């Protein structure tokens, strides 16, 4: 698998090699729901960060342009609220024919981001295939509109 899968340990955004603020709403080891570049949660609501620090991040396009990353075939994005920024920072890479499919977490309650994600992917000639989430989310009002959407390239 190590020759087929590459995990980016740099936070991704729409900015090229920038130090942006990582905002943590609470400090729990291994916790998600942090936000990079802005203090908003997975629904776009502002929160007061209990911990903040600058961290170097970049865009997908910077990684491919500088040959740090080869153009991927499949992409998975799950970042709790800045998915659209990552897509914006990867537009050139996502136009590449090598990219076949994207799985992206979408919160349908975060309407502006939901619309932005769909618009960007449509512009890049991606077609919606399906959306899924764990059955347990159906009973959880907080996450019942959060899905992993899968798109494929036309």
Residue ranges of predicted features:
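Phosphate/nucleotide-binding beta-alpha loop and adjacent structural elements of enzyme active sites
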Residues: 1-154
């Amino acid at each position: 698998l190590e020759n087929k899968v590459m995990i980016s340990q740099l936070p991704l955004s729409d900015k090229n090699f920038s130090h942006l603020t990582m905002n943590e709403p609470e400090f729990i080891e291994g916790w998600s729901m942090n936000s990079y570049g802005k203090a908003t949660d997975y629904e776009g609501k502002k929160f007061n960060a209990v911990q903040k620090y600058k961290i170097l991040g970049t865009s997908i396009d910077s990684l491919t342009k500088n040959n740090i990353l080869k153009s991927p075939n499949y992409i998975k994005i799950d970042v709790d609220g800045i998915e659209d920024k990552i897509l914006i920072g990867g537009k050139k890479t996502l136009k590449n024919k090598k990219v076949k499919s994207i799985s992206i977490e979408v919160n349908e309650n975060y309407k502006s981001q939901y619309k932005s994600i769909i618009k960007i992917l449509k512009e890049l000639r991606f077609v919606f295939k399906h959306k899924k989430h764990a059955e347990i989310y159906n009973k959880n009002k907080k996450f019942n509109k959060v899905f992993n959407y899968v798109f494929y390239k036309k």
